[in-house]
């Protein structure tokens, strides 16, 4: 179930970002929609708290400093997106940095918050603390418990 009003207008929107220009377009679309309908906007940035498979196979583990740095980077990305949304007129915007694989993090927040719309970009970028958004749309589309908006973000 979702928190959608009886009119079908979303009241709670979750959007994912990795800080890339393409993800910024998805956040901008979600923010514009939230502002237009007065919906709450929750911005999520996921970060990896586990060693990549090659590193783990070599018996190397991540220290708490690396995980803290990844969390801080994801939190900064989400916070900056939230500040832009608020500056653009979104009355109720919040942000979260969530440990885990991006599609799982987005699904979990969507479920936990009883959101009625999840917004993702069609493509993204990958770097040390940010994760590819391209496959996320595919992964969440099969399991999302609410409406899904995939924003065309090709350059």
Give, region by region, the residue ranges found by the protein language model.
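Short secondary-structure boundary segments
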Residues: 45, 121-123, 152-153
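Short, hinge-like loop/turn segments at secondary-structure boundaries
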Residues: 58-62, 111-113, 136-137
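General small-molecule cofactor/ligand-binding pocket signal
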Residues: 44, 94-98, 149
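Glycine-rich, Arg-bearing micro-motifs that act as flexible, cationic patches
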Residues: 117-139
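A short acidic, glycine-rich active-site loop
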Residues: 61-76
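Structural beta-alpha unit
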Residues: 1-9, 83-118, 155
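Small/aliphatic-rich secondary-structure junction motif
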Residues: 3-61, 93
């Amino acid at each position: 179930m979702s928190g959608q009003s009886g009119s079908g207008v979303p009241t709670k929107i979750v959007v994912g970002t990795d800080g890339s220009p393409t993800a910024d377009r998805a956040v901008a679309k979600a923010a514009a929609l939230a502002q237009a309908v007065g919906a709450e906007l929750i911005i999520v940035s996921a970060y990896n708290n586990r060693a990549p498979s090659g590193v783990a196979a070599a018996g190397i583990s991540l220290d708490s400093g690396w995980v803290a740095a990844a969390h801080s980077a994801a939190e900064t990305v989400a916070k900056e997106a939230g500040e832009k949304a608020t500056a653009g007129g979104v009355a109720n915007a919040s942000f979260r940095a969530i440990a885990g694989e991006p599609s799982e993090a987005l699904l979990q927040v969507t479920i936990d918050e009883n959101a009625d719309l999840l917004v993702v970009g069609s493509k993204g970028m990958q770097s040390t603390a940010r994760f590819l958004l391209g496959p996320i749309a595919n992964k969440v589309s099969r399991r999302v418990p609410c409406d899904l908006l995939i924003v065309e973000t090709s350059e």
